[in-house]
Amino acid sequence: MSKDDKVKDRELKDFGIIYLSGVIEDEASETVCKEIIEYNISGKVDHIQMIINSSGGSCPAGFAMIDIMEWSQLPIYTTGIGMIASMGLLVFMTGTKGRRVITPRTSLLSHRYSDISLGNHSQLLAGRKEQDLEHTRIVNHYLRYSEIDSKEKLEEYLLRDVDTWLTPEEAIQFGIADVIEPLNPQINGERR
């Protein structure tokens, strides 16, 4: 990381901002978890603003972030920009209800849990159990953080056998986002 990047990161931290971009993996999860913990300890901010632009990634890494977000005593406001997909969408949904904002151009993707497994028969059977557990965690997360009230409806609309791309309006309808808002309210989708 360059000296300029470190200065910019420090400036974001002064305002309680976490920027999560790219694939969610262990390193990104560790960074985000540490930042949330530091904000809770420091007492310097009254809320955390998490800006997310992520195509998804690892379930264990994402659920580690979600666990720390739920642990946080500070409210965490989430803003989705660019793309919030797969595990990125689950992290976004965990934000404080009423403060989960997406921009009009945000792409949203929901899909069933997917994985690739290699190994002998016994290893594949053991791996299948973990896959079932991950699927159950994902279903329970949607039921907790969306307006969908049953596994059947969830699998009909959002966790189908094919990728489900959502408009920002559909995200509001399903209760996985609360507000559609341009980052600059003066623009309102019009040309300057």
Residue ranges and their predicted role:
Residues 1-192:
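Terminal-region recognition feature
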